[in-house]
């Protein structure tokens, strides 16, 4: 099973601390050795780093850890392959344009019966069930909303109903972002935590690293981190129950 990591913040924030915990699970403290990827949004653009090599000893992962890219929305993934070979085209996250925005998606789980999903003009580049499901989601969205929708809360509610359908085909944990909103849909395991003032000290579970957030933030900062399993041991993470979803915007939970 793969692992997911997402972030939503009200000011551009670096995700180095959480990413450091995640990369250790990519072949170090965890079995997810079949590649990793991370997408940072910046304005309407986004930059993605991917590598089919294990993240815990990937030079590209080290670059991302050492180069604190600040963003308000981040989606990351480490892979334990089940559908599709270990290759760059099968490495999450996947990004496609819809309604003039970059939509980024990462999936944890395994689906059956996915090959019959109709994807319209959206065609997978790789062989994963994950990318096929993403193309299907986008196709369903363009069918329901031929023009750019105004009510994004309703759009994400519709996406959650589509995720319910995919969950019937197996395990479907998902992170999805259009750069402003970050959506988390849970099929088995997904947790989140919102950090705000007064900020304290956090300690990673997977590496002997501690950070005092009060020295890294201002009193107005709000940062939500979403992960498959909690990344820190001395904080209280919220578990999303199977079949439930959360929507975050600028660090705050909106659904």
UniProtKB/Swiss-Prot annotation:
Annotated ranges, domain Glutamine amidotransferase type-2: 2-251
EC number: 2.4.2.-
CDD domains for this protein: YafJ
Broad class of enzyme this protein falls into: transferase
SUPFAM superfamilies: N-terminal nucleophile aminohydrolases (Ntn hydrolases)
Pfam families: GATase_4
Protein name, as recorded: Putative glutamine amidotransferase YafJ
Organism domain of life: Bacteria
Gene Ontology terms, MF aspect: transferase activity
Active site as annotated: 2
Keywords for the protein's UniProt record, in alphabetical order: Glutamine amidotransferase, Transferase
Gene source species: Escherichia coli (strain K12)
């Amino acid at each position: 099973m793969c692992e997911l990591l997402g972030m939503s913040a009200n000011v551009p924030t670096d995700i180095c601390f959480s990413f450091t915990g995640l990369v250790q699970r990519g072949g170090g403290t965890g079995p997810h050795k079949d590649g990793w990827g991370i997408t940072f949004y910046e304005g309407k653009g986004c930059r993605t780093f991917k590598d089919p090599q294990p993240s815990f000893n990937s030079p590209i992962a080290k670059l991302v850890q050492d180069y604190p890219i600040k963003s308000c929305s981040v989606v990351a993934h480490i892979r334990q392959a089940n559908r599709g070979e270990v290759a760059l085209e099968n490495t999450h996250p996947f990004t496609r344009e819809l309604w003039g925005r970059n939509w980024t998606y990462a999936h944890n789980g395994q689906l059956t019966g996915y090959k019959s999903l109709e994807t319209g003009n959206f065609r997978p580049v790789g062989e994963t069930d994950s990318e096929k499901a993403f193309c299907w989601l986008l196709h369903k969205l363009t069918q329901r909303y031929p023009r750019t929708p105004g009510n994004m809360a309703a759009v994400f509610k519709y996406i959650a109903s589509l995720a319910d359908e995919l969950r019937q085909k197996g395990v479907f944990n998902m992170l999805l972002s259009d750069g402003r909103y970050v959506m988390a849909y849970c099929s088995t395991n997904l947790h989140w935590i919102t950090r705000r003032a007064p900020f304290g000290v956090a300690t990673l579970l997977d590496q002997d690293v501690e950070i005092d957030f009060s020295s890294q933030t201002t009193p107005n900062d709000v940062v939500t981190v979403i992960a498959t399993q909690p990344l820190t041991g001395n904080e209280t993470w919220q578990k999303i129950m199977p079949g439930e979803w959360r929507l975050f915007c600028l660090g705050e939970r909106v659904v």
